[in-house]
Amino acid sequence: MVGGGGSGGGLLENANPLIYERSGERPVTAGEEDEEVPDSIDAREIFDLIRSINDPEHPLTLEELNVVEQVRIQVSDPESTVAVAFTPTIPHCSMATLIGLSIKVKLLRSLPQRFKMDVHITPGTHASEHAVNKQLADKERVAAALENTHLLEVVNQCLSARS
């Protein structure tokens, strides 16, 4: 795994994380099923996209670790903007950039191209939040990271369904 740790048998940075209960699935409304009614993208839809992303260090999802929460997602469908704040489980988490990159890739693959995305660390929750946020906001650095075969493989593992 990137930065050591991972599920490859190395030492875990946060060996005993708090585990949170998953929220229920969102009920589908009649309006959402009606193809004639425009369906705007909202915070719950974004949360549903990212909640099941796997943590790179633990066999748990970002929702189960409370790394992502619906209340920290801002969406403006008319302005085509999405902002996701995520909270690493510990202030010195070396996986923060990888987690942010995984969220960003999931959104890039799932949302229409018109959307501008801001994926960042919840303010005050990580020792290197400004450096990580700067990396995640830099389109060229994100594109270069995704050209790295090993890193892309790790991101894809985070995005794949657990068996």
Swiss-Prot record:
SUPFAM superfamilies: Fe-S cluster assembly (FSCA) domain-like
UniProt keyword list: Chromosome partition, Cytoplasm, Cytoskeleton, Nucleus
Subcellular location: Nucleus; Cytoplasm, Cytoskeleton, Spindle
An individual GO BP term: chromosome segregation
Coiled-coil zones: none
Matches recorded under Gene3D superfamilies: 6.10.250.1280, Fe-S cluster assembly (FSCA)
Gene Ontology CC: one annotated term: MMXD complex
Family: Belongs to the MIP18 family.
Annotated function: Component of the cytosolic iron-sulfur protein assembly (CIA) complex, a multiprotein complex that mediates the incorporation of iron-sulfur cluster into extramitochondrial Fe/S proteins. As a CIA complex component and in collaboration with CIAO1 and MMS19, binds to and facilitates the assembly of most cytosolic-nuclear Fe/S proteins. As part of the mitotic spindle-associated MMXD complex it plays a role in chromosome segregation, probably by facilitating iron-sulfur cluster assembly into ERCC2/XPD.
Quaternary organization: Component of the CIA complex. Component of the MMXD complex, which includes CIAO1, ERCC2, CIAO2B, MMS19 and SLC25A5. Interacts with CIAO1, ERCC2 and MMS19; the interactions are direct. Interacts with KIF4A; the interaction facilitates the transfer of Fe-S clusters to KIF4A to ensure proper localization of KIF4A to the mitotic machinery. Interacts with CCDC117; the interaction is direct.
Official protein name in the record: Cytosolic iron-sulfur assembly component 2B
Organism: Mus musculus
Lineage: Eukaryota, Metazoa, Chordata, Craniata, Vertebrata
